[in-house]
UniProtKB/Swiss-Prot annotation:
Residues that carry a glycan: 144
Gene name for this UniProt entry: CHAD
BP terms from Gene Ontology: bone development; negative regulation of bone trabecula formation
The keyword Secreted is assigned to this record: yes
Species: Homo sapiens (Human)
Name assigned to this protein: Chondroadherin
Predominant cellular place of this UniProt entry's protein: secreted
Length: 359
């Protein structure tokens, strides 16, 4: 009697196993259930998938709250897609157990609240996309588990302020996108934990002054985008801490009126600068023309006097003809800076030839 009962139990278990490992209803599965695609299939709760699943695409479904342990039974997941899922809240421990996860896509949701602990266990996460949500703040320690984070997209949210410790723990972060938020200030210390940033985009915010203190600990920024902020002026030593690495700088559409004389101190590798659509009439004497390859200048009221002779010389040496014209003096108004006679009487410095040293 024992043997028939044992056989019956084994039979029931065998029947259960395929169901547990089966492809979720209305989804498409590939690579022996390693890739599970449930894009826009009307899901309202996270489906059960095989433990060997590596890619799970749940885009365009409806998960208002990601509760704790929502994905705990998926230990081998590497890539998780949750875009356009009407998510409002991510609870503490929502991704607990996903210790192999590298890609996490949470873009285009309605996320307002990210609880402390939301990203616990995500020690291998490298790419985090939180753009196009309604996040208003980053709680201190939120990113602490993300010790391997490389790219963080937070553009198109509602963040008003960055406080000290906002990026605590994310020491390997290299690309940070904060474009199109509501930032009016970057507090001193806000970026101290991510001193290895190479790309920092904070354009289309409400920064009314250049955040010198917040940027002072950054060491290797190659690309800095500050477009569409009401900055008006750039102070001395603005880029000095990362001046040996800075290659691309966006300051267009900022109502910028002036650079301090020492604004570009320490900047030696700058190649591309965007200054269009501002209120500039001069450039500082130490503007780094020597390394420059492209310079966007249009729609500025340039004052064509000898103070601008460095720009004239740079333009003469370039095959391209940036559309920059004089606004003053009156007799040169509308003339191209490259062609005008406004600089005829200016003395241009000449490069001295090196003399042989004494032996």
């Amino acid at each position: 009697m024992v043997r028939p009962m044992l056989l019956l139990s084994l039979g029931l278990l065998a029947g259960l196993l395929p169901a547990l490992a089966a492809c979720p209803q209305n989804c498409h599965c590939h690579s022996d259930l390693q890739h599970v695609i449930c894009d826009k299939v009307g899901l309202q709760k996270i489906p059960k998938v095989s433990e060997k699943t590596k890619l799970l695409n749940l885009q365009r479904n409806n998960f208002p709250v990601l509760a704790a342990n929502s994905f705990r039974a998926m230990p081998n997941l590497v890539s998780l897609h949750l875009q356009h899922c009407q998510i409002r809240e991510v609870a503490a421990g929502a991704f607990r157990g996903l210790k192999q996860l590298i890609y996490l896509y949470l873009s285009h949701n309605d996320i307002r609240v990210l609880r402390a602990g939301a990203f616990d266990d995500l020690t291998e996460l490298t790419y985090l996309y939180l753009d196009h949500n309604k996040v208003t703040e980053l709680p201190r320690g939120l990113l602490s588990p993300l010790v391997n984070l490389f790219i963080l997209q937070l553009n198109n949210n509602k963040i008003r302020e960055l406080r000290a410790g906002a990026f605590q723990g994310a020491k390997d972060l290299r690309w940070l996108y904060l474009s199109e938020n509501a930032l009016s200030s970057l507090q001193p210390g806000a970026l101290d934990d991510v001193e290895n940033l190479a790309k920092f985009h904070v354009d289309r915010n409400q920064l009314s002054s250049y955040p010198s203190a917040a940027l002072s600990k950054l060491r290797v920024v190659e690309e800095l985008k500050l477009s569409h902020n009401p900055l008006k002026s750039i102070p001395d030593n603005a880029f000095q801490s990362f001046g040996r690495y800075l290659e691309t700088l966006w300051l267009d559409n900022t109502n910028l009126e002036k650079f301090s004389d020492g604004a570009f101190l320490g900047v030696t590798t700058l190649k591309h600068v965007h200054l269009e659509n501002n209120r500039l009439n001069q450039l500082p004497s130490n503007f780094p023309f020597d390394s420059l390859e492209t310079l966007a200048l249009t729609n500025n009221p340039w004052k064509c006097t000898c103070q601008l002779r460095g720009l004239r010389r740079w333009l003469e040496a370039k095959a391209s003809r940036p559309d920059a014209t004089c606004a003053s003096p009156a007799k040169f108004k509308g003339q191209h800076i490259r062609d005008t006679d406004a600089f005829r009487s200016c003395k241009f410095p000449t490069k001295r030839s090196k003399k042989a040293g004494r032996h």
